[in-house]
């Protein structure tokens, strides 16, 4: 009979201990019940190359002895324990095993989980990663579910994960076979953050995106969803537009066919470059009923709200985002961050490009299904 595998013992990354190296220590917590057991220690001195250590070792706790160390990431700081002097080995082992349980039971998590399903993305995924690395707010994790039938993208994701502990790729079989709703649902279910940030596999978050979202969520703590403005552009740099009316005068203009006249284009500068930004509407009785005027990227759900409304519909291969937006509107308040925070790239071969008729057909039926609830919600919000 095959033996069951042994579980991972508590792991500590230790700085400032005279005993350098990798070794086991035995704790005597609850020794009177015969529960003595080992913990794993990785000891370095002084603190050098912390991010590499944290990425490769994946410790439960970080012990700093006589060292005043602080990470730039708050979720990492919550795992740090400062000691003034070197304890006996059994005391150190007891601290490690106890604090491993206490901290892992304290729901330590980053504020933002950026979630991304990938499909034959290849090198384009590096553009998405570059946008994350350049964020002014760095306490994030990136949860990816590779839905590719080959290994090319997976190899790139594994390499990123080995160099950055915040990158967390997953391969789930069977793959979805093109069911975008299921792929996004899987990615969100694996995410630990307080907020879930949707990013497509070849897109780009502008540098202040997460910082601006952090400020907005703190300003309006009762809201469960946020969205911003974006620029849609092609791989050659040409920018997409709907109609030819620019600026705020386009709002409500009879010749503006962008988002039924509620959406506008405007020029804005980011990183020394001018972009044609798209401002999608504030929620109103018309915009919430149509997929072409619903909130666009960047879209962000508070995780408890996302779970409460059921997340992305696993049985909707397309139009899943519209259905989720409607369900979110019925449940919570929304924040419109009126700033361009997202670059959405179009390679003429996206899910939207290849399924326009099916997406619009399903979206109209979703509107019909939720129409009365939308009406009642609008009445409720108007009270």
Question: Where are the predicted features?
Answer:
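N-proximal low-complexity "stem/linker" segments adjacent to membrane-targeting elements
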Residues: 2-7, 85-131
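Short, acidic, metal-binding catalytic loop of nucleotide-sugar glycosyltransferases
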Residues: 130-139
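Conserved donor NDP-sugar-binding/catalytic core segment of glycosyltransferases
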Residues: 210-268
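Catalytic core of nucleotide-sugar-dependent glycosyltransferases
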Residues: 250-254, 340-347, 353-382
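A conserved acidic beta->alpha catalytic loop
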Residues: 146-156, 200
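Acidic donor-binding loop at a coil-to-helix junction in glycosyltransferase catalytic cores
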Residues: 317-324
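Glycine-rich, basic loop-to-helix element that forms the pyrophosphate-binding segment
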Residues: 173-191
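Short aromatic/hydrophobic "clamp" motif used to bind/position activated sugar donors
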Residues: 196
């Amino acid at each position: 009979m095959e033996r069951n595998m042994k579980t991972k013992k508590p792991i500590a990354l230790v700085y400032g201990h005279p005993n350098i190296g990798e070794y086991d220590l035995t704790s005597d917590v609850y020794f009177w019940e015969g529960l003595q057991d080992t913990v794993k220690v990785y000891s370095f001195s002084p603190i050098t190359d912390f991010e590499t250590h944290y990425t490769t070792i994946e410790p439960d706790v970080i012990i700093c002895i006589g060292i005043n160390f602080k990470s730039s990431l708050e979720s990492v700081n919550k795992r740090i324990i400062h000691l003034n002097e070197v304890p006996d080995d059994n005391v150190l082992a007891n601290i490690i095993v106890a604090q491993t349980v206490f901290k892992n039971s304290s729901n330590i998590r980053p504020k933002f989980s950026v979630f991304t399903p990938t499909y034959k993305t290849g090198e384009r995924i590096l553009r998405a990663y570059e946008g994350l690395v350049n964020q002014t707010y760095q306490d994030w994790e990136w949860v990816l579910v590779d839905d590719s039938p080959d290994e090319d993208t997976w190899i790139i994701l594994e390499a990123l994960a080995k160099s950055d502990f915040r990158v967390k790729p997953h391969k789930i079989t069977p793959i979805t076979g093109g069911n975008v709703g299921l792929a996004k649902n899987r990615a969100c279910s694996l995410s630990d953050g307080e907020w879930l940030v949707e990013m497509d596999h070849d897109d780009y978050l502008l540098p202040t995106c997460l910082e601006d979202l952090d400020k907005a969520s703190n300003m309006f703590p009762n809201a469960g969803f946020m969205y911003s403005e974006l620029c849609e552009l092609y791989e050659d740099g040409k920018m997409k537009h709907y109609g030819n009316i620019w600026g705020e005068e386009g709002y409500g203009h009879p010749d503006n066919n962008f988002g039924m006249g509620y959406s506008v284009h405007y020029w804005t500068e980011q990183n020394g470059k001018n972009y044609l930004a798209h401002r999608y509407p504030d929620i109103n009785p018309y915009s919430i009923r149509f997929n072409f005027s619903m909130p666009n990227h960047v879209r962000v759900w508070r995780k408890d709200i996302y779970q409460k409304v059921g997340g992305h519909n696993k049985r909707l291969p397309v139009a899943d985002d519209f259905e989720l937006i409607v369900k979110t509107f019925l449940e919570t308040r929304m924040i419109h961050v009126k700033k361009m925070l997202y670059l959405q790239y179009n390679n003429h071969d996206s899910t939207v490009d290849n399924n326009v008729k099916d997406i619009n057909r399903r979206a109209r039926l979703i509107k019909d299904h939720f129409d009365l609830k939308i009406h009642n919600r609008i009445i409720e919000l108007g009270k």
